[in-house]
């Protein structure tokens, strides 16, 4: 039986070039995302530990952005095709194939973790495990920025994403899961992307307790 990780990896490996071309400059039209990522980078630098992981890095464009913002950033992704593309596009940066629930990082090693829409394909019942893993690799006071599709519903909503099945989350519910994992949410941003998806673009910033 094919699990959701295998399905997601295969699906993204099949759209590497298309995905990279669509998202390479996407943040130029997303000022809210740029602001949250910039704030995240500033706060990570302030911890004195600039080492940061871009989990679910895809073609590596946000890893490069974090590097430009002064972080010692590296990228991790489930899809080997995405990692190959990222290495070719950004040869000076480090990229490695990895699963988000089993990161190849020592305990308390990072000042920051960026998860930019990279947890959206995880079934709700498995998300606590993923969040606990992000908490494990963060040093005390380290930062996690999670970006996701938000919903006004009370529970996560499954929908047919163009690449693989995905879930939108109520921000309050996801904040509770972050807190349960030892990650204290202290800032959030939700906005309407003026699209026909029917979801909010949502961002939660949390600090490792």
Predicted regions mapped to residue ranges:
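Conserved class I S-adenosyl-L-methionine
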Residues: 1-47, 152
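Acceptor-substrate binding/catalytic loop of class I
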Residues: 157-173
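Core SAM-dependent methyltransferase catalytic element
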Residues: 194-209
């Amino acid at each position: 039986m094919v699990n959701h990780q295998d399905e997601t990896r295969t699906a993204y490996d099949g759209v590497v070039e298309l995905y990279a071309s669509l998202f390479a400059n996407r943040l130029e039209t997303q000022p809210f995302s740029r602001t949250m990522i910039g704030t995240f980078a500033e706060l990570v630098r302030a911890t004195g530990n600039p080492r940061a992981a871009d989990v679910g890095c895809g073609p590596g464009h946000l890893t490069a952005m974090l590097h430009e913002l002064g972080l010692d950033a590296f990228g991790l992704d489930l899809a080997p095709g995405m990692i190959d593309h990222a290495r070719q596009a950004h040869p000076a940066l480090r990229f490695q194939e990895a699963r988000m629930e089993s990161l190849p990082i020592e305990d308390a090693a990072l000042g920051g973790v960026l998860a930019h829409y990279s947890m959206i394909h995880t079934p709700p019942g498995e998300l606590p495990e993923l969040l606990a893993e992000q908490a494990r690799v963060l040093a005390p006071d380290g930062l996690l920025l999670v970006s996701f599709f938000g919903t006004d519903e009370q529970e996560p909503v499954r929908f047919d994403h163009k690449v693989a099945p995905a879930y939108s989350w109520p921000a309050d519910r996801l904040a509770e899961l972050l807190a349960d994992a030892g990650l204290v949410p202290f800032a959030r941003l939700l906005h309407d992307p003026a699209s026909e998806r029917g979801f909010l673009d949502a961002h939660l910033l949390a600090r490792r307790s």
